[in-house]
Amino acid sequence: MIDNSQTPKISFCITCKNRLYQIKKTLPQNLEDNRRLQEIVEFVLVDFGSTDGLRKWISDNFKHEIRSGYLKYFYTEEMVYWHASIAKNTAHMLAQNDILVNLDCDNYTGSNGGW
């Protein structure tokens, strides 16, 4: 059992644009692998105007995770051209936890956030 009072909290920050084919594989697995730690883990997914159905897929499949705060989903069309630093900084601003970890859409965290 993890003592959550002393454990730093972690935010996995994912930035995405038109990578539904990748996030469909990784996000459900990452959420499941870390579900028992959701008091200290959050996932932040920032969608920069995807046109491949990502927004609908998230809405259809992750209502519970979004309501609970385990998954934060943010959609914006403000970034016309992809810029990795802007994307990551946007996700970091939305994250609430002590440790911020950048994930690409095709990255897996492993069980327990890799701890």
Predicted region positions:
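A conserved hydrophobic helix/loop-capping motif in glycosyltransferases and polysaccharide synthases
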Residues: I10-Q22, T26, D33, V46
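Short, acidic, metal-binding catalytic loop of nucleotide-sugar glycosyltransferases
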Residues: P28-I40
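Short beta-strand/loop segment that forms part of the nucleotide-sugar
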Residues: E39-G49, F74-E77
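Glycine-rich, basic loop-to-helix element that forms the pyrophosphate-binding segment
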Residues: E78-A95
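Short aromatic/hydrophobic "clamp" motif used to bind/position activated sugar donors
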Residues: L100
